[in-house]
């Protein structure tokens, strides 16, 4: 008897705080996912980093042996300055001197990466004025970009997602949930094909040092707004039509970001995902719901009474003959 009572009380406790338990498991799962990613990245990339460090030490030692007139301190000062300039997007290589980082097309590409919060980091402002303007420009531009993307995605979603699903549901009688799932999968497949696979194939041809995997990696890192900056198109030494290429990449990033948001919005509108998300949300209190219901009822009652009073006044204004006739009947006997 006591065991059954204890079990039922535990079940009621779990059901009462189900949202809190789900949220706790969500936080724990997210932290474990972070740790899992750190372990995998460290185990995969650390050996390659060690090999690269050993190779650089050998090259440095060989260079110093071949140039005995140069001290190690002088070489390190030179390399430090070169690396510092490289971090700002400036290269000392002779065949890279013709590529400017702040011509109009490069600045347009930089502005698009700032507003979309991609931020490759290969080109950064050098002057104090440029850094100050970048802060002000981002503070205004990022919310403006979010507003712009929200409006564009909302309009596209109506024509691309909601109307097709409603059409197949009404015209052919298919289940709305099934149609929504099939439509979301097809839309995701088309988006991945048009903005990942096809551009990756194009980049692998236009960029000399990129293979298909590296090109696909760039597309994903860019359209997911991660923007690591290890792969940036249009930075080749002998890049043809560089200005036109930069403008095309800017348009691709903007259209691809819109397409990604449309797909995400389409999946978020699925009934199953809505139910899944509600598991982690805080439920409204019953008292709060009752207050909202009472306020709604009061507003409805007051609006009804106001409408009734207005209708009575309109009837009085629209019936002048009735009023004059009744007054004549009252005054008539008195005059006689």
UniProtKB/Swiss-Prot annotation:
Keywords: Cell membrane, Cell projection, Cytoplasmic vesicle, Disulfide bond, Endosome, Glycoprotein, Ion channel, Ion transport, Isopeptide bond, Membrane, Phosphoprotein, Potassium, Potassium channel, Potassium transport, Synapse, Transmembrane, Transmembrane helix, Transport, Ubl conjugation
GO cellular component, one term: plasma membrane
Record-linked Pfam families: Ion_trans_2
Taxonomy of the source species: Eukaryota, Metazoa, Chordata, Craniata, Vertebrata
Protein name: Potassium channel subfamily K member 1
Stretches for region Selectivity filter 1: 117-122
Subcellular location per the Swiss-Prot or TrEMBL entry: Cell membrane; Recycling endosome; Synaptic cell membrane; Cytoplasmic vesicle
Region feature (Important for intracellular retention in recycling endosomes): 293-299
Note: When the external K(+) concentration is lowered to subphysiological levels, it takes several minutes till the channel has reached a new, stable state characterized by increased Na(+) permeability. Likewise, when the external pH is lowered to values below 6.5, it takes several minutes till the channel has reached a new, stable state characterized by increased Na(+) permeability. When raising the K(+) concentration back to 5 mM, it takes 40 to 70 minutes for the channel to regain its original selectivity for K(+).
Origin species: Homo sapiens (Human)
Residues passing through the membrane, by range: 21-41, 133-156, 182-202, 244-267
Highest taxon in the source lineage: Eukaryota
Similarity-based family: Belongs to the two pore domain potassium channel (TC 1.A.1.8) family.
């Amino acid at each position: 008897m006591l065991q059954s009572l204890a079990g039922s009380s535990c079940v009621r406790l779990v059901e009462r705080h189900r949202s809190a338990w789900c949220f706790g498991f969500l936080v724990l799962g997210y932290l474990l996912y972070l740790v899992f990613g750190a372990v995998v990245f460290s185990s995969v990339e650390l050996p390659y980093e060690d090999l690269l460090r050993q190779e650089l030490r050998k090259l440095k030692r060989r260079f110093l042996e071949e140039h005995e007139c140069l001290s190690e301190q002088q070489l390190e000062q030179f390399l430090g300055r070169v690396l510092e300039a490289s971090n700002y997007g400036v290269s000392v290589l002779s065949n890279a001197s013709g590529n400017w980082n702040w011509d109009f097309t490069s600045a347009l590409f930089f502005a698009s990466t700032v507003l979309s919060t991609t931020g490759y980091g290969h080109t950064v402002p050098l002057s104090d004025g440029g850094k100050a303007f970048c802060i002000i420009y981002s503070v205004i531009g990022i919310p403006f970009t979010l507003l712009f993307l929200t409006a564009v995605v909302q309009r596209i979603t109506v024509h691309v997602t909601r109307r097709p699903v409603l059409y197949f549901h009404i015209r052919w009688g298919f289940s709305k949930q099934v149609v929504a799932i099939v439509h979301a999968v097809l839309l995701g497949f088309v988006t991945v094909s048009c903005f990942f696979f096809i551009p990756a194939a194009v980049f692998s041809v236009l960029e000399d040092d990129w293979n298909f995997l590296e090109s696909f990696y760039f597309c994903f890192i860019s359209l997911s707004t991660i923007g690591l900056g290890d792969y940036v198109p249009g930075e080749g030494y002998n890049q043809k039509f560089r200005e036109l290429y930069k403008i095309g990449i800017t348009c691709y990033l903007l259209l691809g970001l819109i397409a990604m948001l449309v797909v995400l919005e389409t999946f978020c509108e699925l009934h199953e995902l809505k139910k899944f998300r509600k598991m982690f949300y805080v439920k409204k209190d019953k008292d709060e719901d009752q207050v909202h219901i009472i306020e709604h009822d009061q507003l409805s009652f007051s609006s009804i009474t106001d409408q009734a009073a207005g209708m009575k006044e309109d009837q009085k204004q629209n019936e002048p003959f009735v009023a004059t006739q009744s007054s004549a009947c009252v005054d008539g006997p008195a005059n006689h």
